[in-house]
C-alpha cells in the first residue's frame, strides 16, 4: 500500500461518539415556583416551558450533519433492519386486492379507508447468487426460495399479527436493463460537440462520466473529493428506479397514495441503506406524476425505498420468524399467491419468462454498465475491436475501442475498491499551482511576461480525463463481494447440506485462499443466472412504444425511462 494512502482513507465510517458534534440545545431545569424569590430577576435563558417534548434526531439529520457520521452503518442498521420489516408487517395489515373483469386489481373501499399497506419487494441478482452459493442450489432455485419466503404460505404469511406478506417481488435486473441503455445514451451525448447535443449542458455530467450506482463510492466522493461530483452520472440506481416505478404505477393503477405502498429492497451491501435515506430519492422528483391521487397522508416525504436489508439480514429475518429457508419449496408460487400486475404490458415487462442463456463474464459482477457502453459503441462502429489492458490488479481494467485501422475511438475503465479509487481520483484532480521557491515555470504567455509556476502534479493530473466512462464500485471484486453478503463463516452455520460449501468444512477461521474460493463460488452462481435474451426487449435503444402508451401521462424522464 502506498505511503500516501493511510488506513483511515480506506474506511469512511466513523463510529458515532458519546457527544454529537451538533447537539440539541437544552435549557437549564426550571426551579420550583415555591422556592423562587418574588423579587428575583430571572434571565430569559433560564426560563423553560413545562412538559417539553423529548428532542429527536432522525437519520436524515445525522446524514445532513456530516460531522460524526459518514457512512453511518451503526445508525442505518438500527433504523433499517429485519426488525423494521417485522414491525411494519405487524403494524399494518396487507391491502386485499380484488380483480376487476378487465384485469387490473383494485383495493376494497373498506381497506382503502384503513391503515393497510401494499407490500412490494425488489431483490438484486447478487443476493440470489449469495443464497445459491450458500445452500448449493441454482440461481433460479434461489429465486424460488426468496419468493416462497416473502409471498408464500410457508413464509412470512404463516406468522405475524396480520399474516401479511409481499404481493409482488421484483428483480432489479429489469430496471437495470433500462438504465444500461440510458447510460450509453448519456455517455454518447457527452462525446458530441456542444452544438449537436440533444440534452442541455447543465443536465449532462462532465467527461469522464463516472458511474453513480454505488452509494459507498458516492458517499466517499461527497465527503472527501467534491471536485469529482460534476462527473457523476445523473441516473438513478436500479434500486431507486425500481422504487419510483412501483410506487408511481401502483399508486395510479390502484388509486392509493404512494405512502401506502411499502417497498423493501434486499441488497448486497449496507451502503444501500444510506442511498435509500437520501432526500433526493423521494417523491419530490416524481410527485407531479399522480394527478388527482393524494400523494401522502401526511407532510412526510415518500421515499423510493422504505427499508433496505442485506443478504445476511434476510437470513436473520427468516430466523426471527422461525423459518428455515432450505426447507421452503424450491418451486414457483401458486397463482393464488402471485397476482398479476395491474397492467398486462407491465406484468410482462416486470415478470418476464427466462430462458437458459448465461450472463457474460465480461460484463462483471456489478451490473455491466461499462460492458454495455462498450458494446453499444462497438455496434455503432462496425469492424471495431475492444482491447483490454489490465492494471496493477484485477480490479483495475482499461478498455480501448479500436477502429479497423488501429485508431482509438474511445477509452473506458473499471475501478473497484477504495485503494484503486484513490488512484482514479488522483488522475482527475485538477492541477495545483506550486508555490515552492525554485519551481519550474512555463514560457511567457501571449498575454504578457508573467511567469507562472508549474505544479509537480500537472503531468499526471487530469490524465484520467481521456476516459469516456468509468465504472466505479467501492467493493473489491464488485457487488458480489458486498459487505452485506453471506460470508463463508455464515454459510457454514446456515447451510444444511454437506455439499453446499465445498472445501470449507474446517470450522477454523477461513484463510485468504478459502475466502477467494468462496467469492469465486458466488461469482459462478451470479454468472450462471438465467437471463432473458428477449428481455433486452427493445432496451437496446429506447423503451418500447407500448410501454410508453401504457404509462399514459406519466413523464418517463422523471423516473429515468427516457
From Swiss-Prot:
<feature type="region of interest" description="Disordered">
    <location>
        <begin position="439"/>
        <end position="462"/>
    </location>
</feature>
<dbReference type="Pfam" id="PF02906">
    <property type="entry name" value="Fe_hyd_lg_C"/>
</dbReference>
<feature type="binding site">
    <location>
        <position position="62"/>
    </location>
    <ligand>
        <name>[4Fe-4S] cluster 1</name>
    </ligand>
</feature>
<feature type="binding site">
    <location>
        <position position="20"/>
    </location>
    <ligand>
        <name>[4Fe-4S] cluster 1</name>
    </ligand>
</feature>
<dbReference type="GO" id="GO:0051536">
    <property type="term" value="F:iron-sulfur cluster binding"/>
</dbReference>
<feature type="binding site">
    <location>
        <position position="65"/>
    </location>
    <ligand>
        <name>[4Fe-4S] cluster 1</name>
    </ligand>
</feature>
<feature type="binding site">
    <location>
        <position position="479"/>
    </location>
    <ligand>
        <name>[4Fe-4S] cluster 2</name>
    </ligand>
</feature>
<feature type="binding site">
    <location>
        <position position="475"/>
    </location>
    <ligand>
        <name>[4Fe-4S] cluster 2</name>
    </ligand>
</feature>
<feature type="binding site">
    <location>
        <position position="269"/>
    </location>
    <ligand>
        <name>[4Fe-4S] cluster 2</name>
    </ligand>
</feature>
<feature type="compositionally biased region" description="Polar residues">
    <location>
        <begin position="452"/>
        <end position="462"/>
    </location>
</feature>
<dbReference type="InterPro" id="IPR009016">
    <property type="entry name" value="Fe_hydrogenase"/>
</dbReference>
<keyword id="KW-0479">Metal-binding</keyword>
<feature type="compositionally biased region" description="Polar residues">
    <location>
        <begin position="29"/>
        <end position="40"/>
    </location>
</feature>
<protein>
    <recommendedName>
        <fullName>Cytosolic Fe-S cluster assembly factor nar1</fullName>
    </recommendedName>
</protein>
<feature type="binding site">
    <location>
        <position position="214"/>
    </location>
    <ligand>
        <name>[4Fe-4S] cluster 2</name>
    </ligand>
</feature>
<comment type="similarity">
    <text>Belongs to the NARF family.</text>
</comment>
<dbReference type="InterPro" id="IPR050340">
    <property type="entry name" value="Cytosolic_Fe-S_CAF"/>
</dbReference>
<dbReference type="InterPro" id="IPR004108">
    <property type="entry name" value="Fe_hydrogenase_lsu_C"/>
</dbReference>
<dbReference type="GO" id="GO:0051539">
    <property type="term" value="F:4 iron, 4 sulfur cluster binding"/>
</dbReference>
<feature type="binding site">
    <location>
        <position position="68"/>
    </location>
    <ligand>
        <name>[4Fe-4S] cluster 1</name>
    </ligand>
</feature>
<feature type="region of interest" description="Disordered">
    <location>
        <begin position="28"/>
        <end position="47"/>
    </location>
</feature>
<comment type="function">
    <text>Component of the cytosolic Fe/S protein assembly machinery. Required for maturation of extramitochondrial Fe/S proteins. May play a role in the transfer of pre-assembled Fe/S clusters to target apoproteins.</text>
</comment>
<feature type="region of interest" description="Disordered">
    <location>
        <begin position="492"/>
        <end position="513"/>
    </location>
</feature>
<feature type="compositionally biased region" description="Polar residues">
    <location>
        <begin position="494"/>
        <end position="505"/>
    </location>
</feature>
<dbReference type="GO" id="GO:0016226">
    <property type="term" value="P:iron-sulfur cluster assembly"/>
</dbReference>
<dbReference type="GO" id="GO:0046872">
    <property type="term" value="F:metal ion binding"/>
</dbReference>
<feature type="region of interest" description="Disordered">
    <location>
        <begin position="541"/>
        <end position="562"/>
    </location>
</feature>
<keyword id="KW-0411">Iron-sulfur</keyword>
<keyword id="KW-0004">4Fe-4S</keyword>
<keyword id="KW-0408">Iron</keyword>
Amino acid at each position: 500500500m502506498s505511503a500516501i494512502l493511510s488506513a483511515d482513507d480506506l474506511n469512511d465510517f466513523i463510529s458515532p461518539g458519546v457527544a454529537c458534534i451538533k447537539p440539541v440545545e437544552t435549557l437549564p431545569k426550571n426551579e420550583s415556583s415555591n422556592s423562587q424569590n418574588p423579587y428575583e430577576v430571572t434571565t430569559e435563558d433560564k426560563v423553560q416551558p413545562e412538559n417539553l417534548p423529548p428532542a429527536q434526531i432522525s437519520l436524515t439529520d445525522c446524514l445532513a450533519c456530516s460531522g460524526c457520521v459518514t457512512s453511518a452503518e451503526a445508525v442505518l442498521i438500527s433504523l433499517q433492519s429485519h426488525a423494521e420489516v417485522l414491525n411494519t408487517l405487524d403494524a399494518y395489515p396487507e391491502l386485499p386486492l380484488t380483480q376487476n373483469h378487465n384485469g387490473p386489481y383494485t383495493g376494497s373501499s373498506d381497506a382503502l379507508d384503513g391503515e393497510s399497506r401494499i407490500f412490494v419487494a425488489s431483490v438484486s441478482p447478487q443476493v440470489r447468487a449469495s443464497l445459491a452459493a450458500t445452500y448449493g442450489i441454482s440461481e433460479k432455485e434461489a429465486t424460488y426460495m426468496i419468493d416462497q419466503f416473502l409471498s408464500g404460505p410457508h413464509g412470512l404469511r404463516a406468522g405475524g399479527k396480520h399474516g401479511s406478506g409481499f404481493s409482488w417481488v421484483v428483480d432489479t435486473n429489469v430496471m437495470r436493463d433500462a438504465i444500461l441503455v440510458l447510460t450509453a445514451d448519456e455517455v454518447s451525448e457527452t462525446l458530441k460537440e456542444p452544438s449537436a447535443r440533444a440534452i442541455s449542458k447543465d443536465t449532462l455530467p462532465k467527461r469522464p462520466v463516472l458511474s453513480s450506482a454505488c452509494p459507498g463510492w458516492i458517499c466517499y466522493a461527497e465527503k472527501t473529493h467534491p471536485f469529482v461530483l460534476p462527473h457523476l452520472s445523473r441516473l438513478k440506481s436500479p434500486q431507486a428506479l425500481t422504487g419510483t416505478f412501483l410506487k408511481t404505477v401502483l399508486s395510479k393503477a390502484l388509486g392509493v397514495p404512494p405512502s401506502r405502498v411499502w417497498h423493501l429492497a434486499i441488497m448486497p451491501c449496507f451502503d444501500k441503506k444510506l442511498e435509500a435515506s437520501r432526500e433526493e430519492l423521494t417523491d419530490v422528483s416524481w410527485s407531479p406524476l399522480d394527478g388527482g391521487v393524494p400523494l401522502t397522508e401526511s407532510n412526510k416525504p415518500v421515499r423510493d425505498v422504505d427499508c433496505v436489508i442485506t443478504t445476511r439480514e434476510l437470513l436473520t429475518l427468516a430466523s426471527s420468524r422461525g423459518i428455515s429457508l432450505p426447507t421452503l419449496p424450491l418451486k414457483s408460487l401458486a397463482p393464488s399467491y402471485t397476482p398479476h400486475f395491474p397492467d398486462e404490458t407491465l406484468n410482462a415487462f416486470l415478470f418476464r419468462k427466462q430462458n437458459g442463456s448465461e450472463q457474460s463474464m465480461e460484463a462483471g459482477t456489478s451490473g455491466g454498465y461499462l460492458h454495455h457502453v462498450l458494446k453499444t459503441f462497438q455496434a455503432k462502429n462496425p469492424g471495431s475491436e475492444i482491447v483490454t489492458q489490465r492494471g496493477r490488479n484485477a480490479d483495475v481494467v482499461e478498455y480501448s475501442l479500436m477502429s479497423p485501422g488501429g485508431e482509438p475511438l474511445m477509452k473506458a475503465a473499471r475501478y473497484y475498491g477504495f485503494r484503486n479509487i484513490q488512484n482514479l481520483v488522483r488522475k482527475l484532480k485538477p492541477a495545483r499551482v506550486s508555490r515552492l521557491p525554485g519551481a519550474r515555470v512555463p514560457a511567457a504567455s501571449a498575454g504578457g511576461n508573467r511567469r507562472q509556476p508549474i505544479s509537480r502534479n500537472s503531468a499526471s493530473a487530469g490524465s484520467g480525463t481521456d476516459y469516456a466512462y468509468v465504472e466505479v464500485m467501492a467493493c473489491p471484486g464488485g457487488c458480489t463481494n458486498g459487505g452485506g453478503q453471506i460470508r463463508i463463516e455464515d454459510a457454514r452455520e446456515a447451510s444444511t447440506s454437506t455439499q453446499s460449501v465445498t472445501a470449507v468444512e474446517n470450522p477454523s477461521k477461513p484463510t485468504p485462499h478459502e475466502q477467494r474460493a468462496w467469492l469465486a463460488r458466488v461469482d459462478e452462481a451470479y454468472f450462471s443466472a438465467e437471463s432473458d435474451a428477449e428481455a433486452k426487449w427493445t432496451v437496446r435503444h429506447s423503451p418500447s412504444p407500448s410501454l410508453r402508451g401504457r404509462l399514459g401521462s406519466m413523464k418517463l424522464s422523471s423516473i429515468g425511462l427516457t
